[in-house]
Structures are given as C-alpha cells and as structure tokens.
C-alpha cells in the first residue's frame, strides 16, 4: 500500500490519518476536518472511507472483496494455528466457499429462531438485573459478559452452566482477529484456540450421536450430508460463537458508557420504554463497537468520485466517522435517542459480509436497555475504565458503574 500511495496521482491531496497511533481518537478535530476535506483518507494500512454515502455504497460494491486475509499478511501474522484460523474465518472468505458456509451459519439468526429466542433473552435480562450487586461494581462482568454468552449457549445447544467458559474462550479467540503480531498475544490466542476447539469438538461429537434443535446439530447434519468437512465444521461453529458474543458484549458496555454521559436520555427511556429500539439505533450510530466496520480489497481497478482504486488496494469503511457525517445526520454530534434518524446504522457492514448476528444483537441490546432503564436509575461511572483499542472490536473491557439517584 505504501508504494501505491506514493505513485497514485489521485491520492496526492487526500488527508492522512494514522489510526494505528495509540493516542489516535476517532472523535478528534483532525478526523472531522479530514471528513470535510475528502470522502476518503490515506492511512498506514488502507484507504479509509469517512463519509456515510460512500461507505454505505462501497461496503456492498462487488468490485471489493473481503480484505481480511490480506490484512493478516499485512500485519505479518506468522504461520501457525492463529494464522490458519484467521484466514479460514468466515469473514476472510469470498465466492462459492463463503456462500456455502455462510448459508449454514445463518441458521441461528433466521427470523424464526430470533422470535423463538426472544423469551429466553428477556427472562435472562431480568435475572441478570436481579443479581446485580449494590453499590459500585464492574458492569461488564455482571451483565455484558453473561448475557450474550448465555444466549449463544442456548442457540448452539451448549449447557447454560458453561456460559462463563464459552464467553472467555470467545474473548481469547477474538484477540486473534485484532490482527496483532505481538508474540505474547499470539501465544495467548493459540492457547485459547486450543481450548476453544477442545470444547467444540466435544460438543460436536455429542451432537453427532444425539442431535437436537440447535445450530450445532444443524451444522452436524450438513457434515453428514457431505456439505462440509471436519475442519470446516468446528471452524464454522467457532465463527458463529465469536460473532454472536464479542461485539454484543462490548456494544452493551458502550451503551452504558453513553448513558452515563447522557443521563437525561436514560430518563426518557424510563418514562417511555417504547423508545428502547430507537435508543439502541442511536447507540449504534454514536459509538459502534466496530469503528472500522468493513475491510475490503479491490478485486479490479476502478474509480469513485475522482479517486482511482487500483487492484489490491485495501479499503476500509469507518462507521464511527461516517455516522457523524453532517451530510446525512442532522445534529450529527449530538446524542439524542428521540431523533428518528433517516439513514440506518452501517455498524454491521454491508454486502455479502453483512454481520450474521445483526438481528440477534439488536434484540439483546433492546431488551437490555429497556429493562435496565425501566428498573434502575441512570448509570454513573464509578472508577477507572479499562478500554480495548484495536483494529477490531473496541470498547470497555472493564466498566465500573453504580446505578445512582435519578
């Protein structure tokens, strides 16, 4: 990319943003100025789409294919189990293999299954609120961690008592998708992958002899039908688990952080719980847990709005910045759950790689926000937050809260 950046004339006047800098902030004036100057910017890793219309368009553009495999090469992830998993992860695939495996992975996220799981989600939310400690506590460990883990156990047919193990295995595995070449992280991810696959193989073998009405059984049936092999079987179950857990976990934590900054918005939900779905959409717009929501690579030479994109160029869509685009969102820099935004969030990407768990994530977020706001006073920050800053999932790993006086 760096060589192309110096030789492609149409890039000469594009702004440059280094989002790999530890001190970088998506909310900085520098980023807003870059978006006003151009719809796209140069970065150390890729071209970065900053405006909503172009990000929405290019996330679905067939001239761009999944860029994840190229990113693995770019950051220099060494040969081994971590690299193997990342390049075989569903979001790394394109074409016939992607369509075949994605078709199987959609089973837990069909409208029928989402409707069927809603009572479980609602009752789980209420039970978790009942168990919240009094005073100051880490909200992540007591709510965003167990909720999606329990839901994924329910959908995959895993014992509910395994939720903590399942969630932590997902966290360890997802570190690999952060595209780090740090040896300590790679060792941790490799160990986590080993534990993850040990757990999944045991669950899969059980479903081979005792099938049920769950996703693991559905995928095992496809294995018996010869649609996928043993390696694809366990990798696909792992993909669904990671996709269904990690982003929901951090998005829930980000929602509470947002409402701690805007307690008046919390009170509006308390007074009118029917605002919860719209509040979730505003959270997704304001603080998407995937700031860079789609990573693509140009499969051919083409041009967009005067910018030439040569074959092989990585192109990233930045949901965080696009969601503050004043061309699309009125009062874009104001968090307001009462405003019905005309443009939908692009937090879940678009095109063939649109996030599988979108409907499930929205369900969990809506049920959680509605119940928490109805039963509790607005959240207040009660200590130092531990933030995760990476190319993939971002948000609080630890969020000390108290639900104080309204």
Curated annotation (Swiss-Prot):
A Gene Ontology BP annotation from the UniProt entry: antibiotic biosynthetic process
Pathway: Antibiotic biosynthesis; Polyketide biosynthesis
Disulphide linkage map: none
Phenotype of gene-disrupted mutants: Inactivation of the gene yields a mutant that cannot produce aureothin. The mutant produces luteothin (also called deoxyaureothin), a metabolite that exhibits a significantly improved cytotoxicity against leukemia cells compared to aureothin.
E.C. number(s) listed in UniProt: 1.14.15.37
Catalytic activity: luteothin + 4 reduced [2Fe-2S]-[ferredoxin] + 2 O2 + 4 H(+) = aureothin + 4 oxidized [2Fe-2S]-[ferredoxin] + 3 H2O
CDD domains (alphabetical): CYP_AurH-like
Alphabetized PROSITE patterns for the sequence: CYTOCHROME_P450
Keyword match Cell inner membrane: no
GO molecular function: heme binding; iron ion binding; monooxygenase activity; oxidoreductase activity, acting on paired donors, with incorporation or reduction of molecular oxygen
Gene3D superfamilies referenced in this protein's UniProt entry, alphabetically: Cytochrome P450
Residues that bind heme b: 98, 102, 296, 350, 353, 355
Subunit structure: Monomer.
Function: Bifunctional cytochrome P450 protein involved in the biosynthesis of the antibiotic aureothin, a nitroaryl polyketide metabolite with antifungal, cytotoxic and insecticidal activities. Catalyzes the hydroxylation of luteothin (also called deoxyaureothin), leading to the formation of the intermediate (7R)-7-hydroxydeoxyaureothin, followed by the formation of the aureothin tetrahydrofuran ring, the final step in the biosynthesis of aureothin.
Record's protein name: Luteothin monooxygenase
Gene: aurH
